[in-house]
């Protein structure tokens, strides 16, 4: 179904969704296909969808209104919710167990970041004080909640959020993802709402993996280490970057969308294995007893040592000074002990035990874990050494067979998981609606 009309420069076509399927076109501005939008207008050399037309109209209307009626205040742009540090901390406490120092640091940093954005909208030209952006570096072992902290912050502030693995990034021209891919993912997360994307949060995981491989200059390029750090500098600090909406290398012919990164908050996280030894060596120069006691430890992390991390330590680890300087807020996370893992299982709003309980409730069954079962889950997770991630792995391995059988079992009102079930040495206890034991058929 097409409808043609004459224009001054030639023919345009209005391509309505639901045509005969013989023509596949994409918006030259946002990259959406004709099937994803209500209408697509085709010009001699380009296409534009109805959503981009509306966005363009809104922009032009505001600009014309400002010129013709300067006394009229323009419509307020999208601004994230400005939440106080205490409110941010209270929200984080509902989902993240422990890590009080890191949560406080994040709460203040995020509050100041979005307060800075808010002040920019009403800043006078004669105001000489310009508040710089403060991106965040989270340092802590695997499974301590770095990603969860960033995700929870984005949900609280109602801003777009995306996660990227730093190990997939390489310099432009090499196999892997360009750094612009980071912004493309945020653009998708915002449903191509540019104004929202420019105030979103990006979490870059495994940032320690792009540390320089060696302190010595090599004749071969370090395309996934220092090269990526150099490529990330401009988007971390704030620049207008041309972003390919479908990804950079598979569709080189596509139109670029310009994103200004000056108000995007970047949170980088990494385990930084071995960093504690670098810190201990530095400290031991002035306090031999303290330093030697740390380096004698066989376990990787000492939380007390990590609290003393400095930018110089990160430089020695392999991050370049320019990159470190663009992540001024440093916060460390502690390894999770047995008490913390036990709390993670049952206390947060989205605790694993509560999630499984909800799934069983949908089948009309009450789920219960005995205290001994929970202790056994924690013990196995500690043995695996991957923090909170191990909890889900242990439970999923145990629960999958139970959840496979349960929907076809009749008359079950309650399912009790014991320590023997966790160790795969016994069956769950099934009770009927009256509380009587029920054997599995």
UniProtKB/Swiss-Prot annotation:
<dbReference type="InterPro" id="IPR050052">
    <property type="entry name" value="ATP-dep_Clp_protease_ClpX"/>
</dbReference>
<dbReference type="InterPro" id="IPR003959">
    <property type="entry name" value="ATPase_AAA_core"/>
</dbReference>
<feature type="binding site">
    <location>
        <position position="30"/>
    </location>
    <ligand>
        <name>Zn(2+)</name>
    </ligand>
</feature>
<keyword id="KW-0143">Chaperone</keyword>
<dbReference type="Pfam" id="PF07724">
    <property type="entry name" value="AAA_2"/>
</dbReference>
<dbReference type="InterPro" id="IPR010603">
    <property type="entry name" value="Znf_CppX_C4"/>
</dbReference>
<comment type="function">
    <text>ATP-dependent specificity component of the Clp protease. It directs the protease to specific substrates. Can perform chaperone functions in the absence of ClpP.</text>
</comment>
<keyword id="KW-0862">Zinc</keyword>
<comment type="similarity">
    <text>Belongs to the ClpX chaperone family.</text>
</comment>
<dbReference type="InterPro" id="IPR004487">
    <property type="entry name" value="Clp_protease_ATP-bd_su_ClpX"/>
</dbReference>
<protein>
    <recommendedName>
        <fullName>ATP-dependent Clp protease ATP-binding subunit ClpX</fullName>
    </recommendedName>
</protein>
<dbReference type="Pfam" id="PF10431">
    <property type="entry name" value="ClpB_D2-small"/>
</dbReference>
<dbReference type="InterPro" id="IPR027417">
    <property type="entry name" value="P-loop_NTPase"/>
</dbReference>
<dbReference type="GO" id="GO:0008270">
    <property type="term" value="F:zinc ion binding"/>
</dbReference>
<keyword id="KW-0067">ATP-binding</keyword>
<feature type="binding site">
    <location>
        <begin position="141"/>
        <end position="148"/>
    </location>
    <ligand>
        <name>ATP</name>
    </ligand>
</feature>
<feature type="binding site">
    <location>
        <position position="27"/>
    </location>
    <ligand>
        <name>Zn(2+)</name>
    </ligand>
</feature>
<dbReference type="InterPro" id="IPR003593">
    <property type="entry name" value="AAA+_ATPase"/>
</dbReference>
<dbReference type="GO" id="GO:0046983">
    <property type="term" value="F:protein dimerization activity"/>
</dbReference>
<dbReference type="InterPro" id="IPR038366">
    <property type="entry name" value="Znf_CppX_C4_sf"/>
</dbReference>
<dbReference type="GO" id="GO:0051603">
    <property type="term" value="P:proteolysis involved in protein catabolic process"/>
</dbReference>
<dbReference type="Pfam" id="PF06689">
    <property type="entry name" value="zf-C4_ClpX"/>
</dbReference>
<dbReference type="GO" id="GO:0051301">
    <property type="term" value="P:cell division"/>
</dbReference>
<dbReference type="GO" id="GO:0051082">
    <property type="term" value="F:unfolded protein binding"/>
</dbReference>
<dbReference type="GO" id="GO:0016887">
    <property type="term" value="F:ATP hydrolysis activity"/>
</dbReference>
<dbReference type="InterPro" id="IPR046425">
    <property type="entry name" value="ClpX_bact"/>
</dbReference>
<feature type="binding site">
    <location>
        <position position="52"/>
    </location>
    <ligand>
        <name>Zn(2+)</name>
    </ligand>
</feature>
<comment type="subunit">
    <text>Component of the ClpX-ClpP complex. Forms a hexameric ring that, in the presence of ATP, binds to fourteen ClpP subunits assembled into a disk-like structure with a central cavity, resembling the structure of eukaryotic proteasomes.</text>
</comment>
<feature type="binding site">
    <location>
        <position position="49"/>
    </location>
    <ligand>
        <name>Zn(2+)</name>
    </ligand>
</feature>
<keyword id="KW-0547">Nucleotide-binding</keyword>
<keyword id="KW-0479">Metal-binding</keyword>
<dbReference type="GO" id="GO:0140662">
    <property type="term" value="F:ATP-dependent protein folding chaperone"/>
</dbReference>
<dbReference type="InterPro" id="IPR019489">
    <property type="entry name" value="Clp_ATPase_C"/>
</dbReference>
<feature type="domain" description="ClpX-type ZB">
    <location>
        <begin position="15"/>
        <end position="68"/>
    </location>
</feature>
<dbReference type="GO" id="GO:0005524">
    <property type="term" value="F:ATP binding"/>
</dbReference>
<dbReference type="GO" id="GO:0009376">
    <property type="term" value="C:HslUV protease complex"/>
</dbReference>
């Amino acid at each position: 179904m097409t409808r043609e009309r004459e224009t001054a420069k030639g023919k345009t076509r209005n391509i309505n969704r639901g045509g005969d399927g013989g023509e596949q076109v994409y918006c030259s501005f946002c990259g959406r296909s004709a099937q994803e939008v209500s209408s697509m207008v085709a010009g001699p050399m380009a296409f534009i969808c109805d959503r981009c037309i509306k966005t363009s109209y809104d922009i032009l209307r505001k600009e014309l209104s400002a010129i013709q009626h300067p006394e009229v205040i323009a419509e307020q742009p999208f601004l994230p919710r400005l939440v106080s540090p205490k409110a941010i901390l209270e929200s984080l406490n509902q989902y993240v167990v422990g890590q009080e120092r890191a949560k406080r640091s994040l709460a203040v940093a995020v509050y100041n970041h979005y307060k800075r954005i808010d002040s920019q909208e009403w800043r006078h030209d004669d105001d000489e004080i310009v508040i710089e952006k403060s991106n965040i570096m989270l340092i802590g072992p695997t499974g301590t909640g770095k990603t969860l902290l960033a995700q929870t912050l984005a949900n609280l502030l109602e801003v777009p959020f995306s996660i990227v693995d730093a190990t997939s990034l390489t310099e432009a021209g090499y196999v892997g993802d360009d750094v612009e891919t980071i912004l493309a993912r945020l653009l998708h997360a915002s449903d191509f709402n540019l104004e929202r994307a420019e105030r979103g949060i990006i979490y870059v995981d495994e940032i320690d993996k792009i540390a320089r491989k060696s302190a010595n200059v090599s004749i071969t390029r370090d395309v996934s280490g220092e090269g990526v750090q150099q490529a990330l500098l401009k988007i971390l600090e704030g620049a207008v970057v041309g972003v390919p909406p479908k990804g950079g290398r598979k569709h080189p012919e596509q139109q670029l969308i310009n994103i200004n990164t000056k108000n995007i908050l970047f949170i980088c996280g990494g385990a930084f294995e071995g960093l504690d030894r670098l810190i201990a060596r530095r400290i031991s120069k002035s306090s031999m007893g303290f330093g030697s006691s740390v380096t004698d430890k066989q376990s990787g992390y000492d939380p007390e040592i990590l609290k003393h991390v400095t930018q110089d330590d990160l430089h020695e680890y392999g991050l370049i000074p320019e990159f470190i300087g663009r992540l001024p807020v440093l916060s460390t996370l502690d390894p999770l002990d047995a008490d913390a893992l036990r709390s993670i299982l049952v206390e947060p709003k989205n605790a694993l035990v509560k999630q499984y309980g909800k799934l069983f409730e949908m089948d009309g069954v009450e789920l219960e874990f005995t205290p001994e079962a929970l202790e056994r889950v924690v013990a196995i997770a500690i043995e695996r050494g991957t923090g909170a991630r191990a909890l889900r792995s242990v439970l999923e391995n145990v629960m999958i067979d139970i959840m496979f059988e349960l929907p076809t079992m009749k008359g079950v009102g309650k399912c009790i998981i014991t320590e023997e079930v966790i160790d795969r040495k016994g069956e769950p206890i099934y009770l009927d609606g009256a509380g009587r034991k029920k054997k599995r058929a």
